[in-house]
């Protein structure tokens, strides 16, 4: 037990010793003139209730990878290489190491823009983002993005502009209980897209085979002097391919349901077994959920290697 502990202590000591040596290497020797190594990137917010972790994915450039939360071993390994790229040792060190994260001001600007857009999409319509660059020793720089979200806007009213009368009548009957957007809730662009998907799901489950969410759009207008937004949902008519005329969306009903085999035409299972695993039923409106369930059911049958459901 004592020998094992001594061995573990030696390994750990060697690792930290190597880390110290590598950390002492000049990591700025490959930097072009007037360039800076991106040392650290930080997010701050004037609103302390803001979840900063939700905005970290918008950071386009970060510093080099750290090991043990302290040492940039991959960067230091890269820095051990000489400038003669023809030598194998230099090539090897560069391949296993990590290139210096040279500050790219274009990416910094893009990050600031993306962060501001993300805040506005989350309902902070007056949001701005500032950047602060702090140059530290040895040509290194720390970048801080300061989020200034401002007040959160809320929905004042939701209006529906449905240009297809048949869909308007059907939605009035089947959709009101499923409506998500309501007066008083925080404005959020993500929720608008979720509403498009919900309406699309309702319609494709009720016969509208060709309907997709691109038929739905939104307009949002802020109320002057208030932190409120009026929302209008627009649902357009159907436009056939290669046509300039709009028509009503067609609702389809399932006719007959038939089964065919593969190349030899032979069914892998009895028709009764296939019918038991088929959610699509004759005489019912087309339903995208039933289509997915049928694919899932057939996928669990070992005798069936491939399923292709076609509508004609």
What do the PLM-derived regions correspond to, one by one?
Residues 10-19:
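Gram-negative bacterial Sec-dependent N-terminal signal peptides
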Residues 2-11:
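Bacterial N-terminal signal peptides that target proteins for export
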Residues 2, 26-301, 306:
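Interaction-mediating elements
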């Amino acid at each position: 037990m004592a020998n094992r502990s001594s061995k573990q202590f030696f390994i750990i000591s060697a690792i930290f010793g190597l880390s110290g040596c590598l950390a002492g290497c000049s990591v700025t020797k490959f930097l072009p003139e007037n360039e800076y190594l991106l040392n650290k990137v930080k997010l701050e917010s004037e609103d302390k209730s803001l979840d900063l972790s939700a905005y970290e994915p918008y950071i386009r450039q970060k510093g080099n990878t750290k090991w043990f939360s302290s040492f940039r071993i991959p960067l230091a390994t890269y820095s051990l290489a000489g400038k003669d790229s023809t030598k194998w040792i230099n090539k090897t060190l560069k391949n296993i190491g990590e290139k210096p994260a040279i500050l790219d001001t274009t990416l910094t600007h893009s990050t600031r823009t993306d962060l501001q857009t993300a805040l506005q999409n989350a309902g902070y319509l007056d949001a701005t983002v500032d950047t602060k660059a702090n140059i530290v020793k040895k040509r290194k720089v720390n970048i801080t993005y300061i989020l200034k979200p401002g007040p959160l806007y809320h929905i004042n009213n939701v209006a529906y502009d449905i240009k297809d009368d048949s869909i308007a009548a059907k939605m009035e009957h089947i959709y009101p209980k499923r409506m998500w957007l309501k007066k008083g809730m925080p404005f959020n662009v993500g929720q608008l897209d979720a509403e498009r998907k919900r309406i699309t799901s309702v319609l494709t489950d009720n016969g509208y085979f060709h309907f997709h969410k691109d038929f739905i759009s939104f307009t949002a207008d802020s109320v002057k002097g208030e932190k409120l937004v009026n929302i209008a949902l627009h649902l357009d008519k159907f436009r056939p391919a290669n046509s300039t005329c709009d028509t009503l969306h067609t609702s389809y009903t399932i006719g007959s349901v038939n089964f065919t085999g593969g190349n030899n035409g032979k069914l892998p299972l009895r028709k009764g077994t296939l019918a038991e695993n088929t959610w699509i039923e004759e005489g019912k409106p087309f339903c995208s959920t039933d289509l997915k369930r049928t694919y899932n059911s057939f996928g669990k049958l070992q005798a069936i290697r491939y399923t292709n459901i076609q509508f004609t």
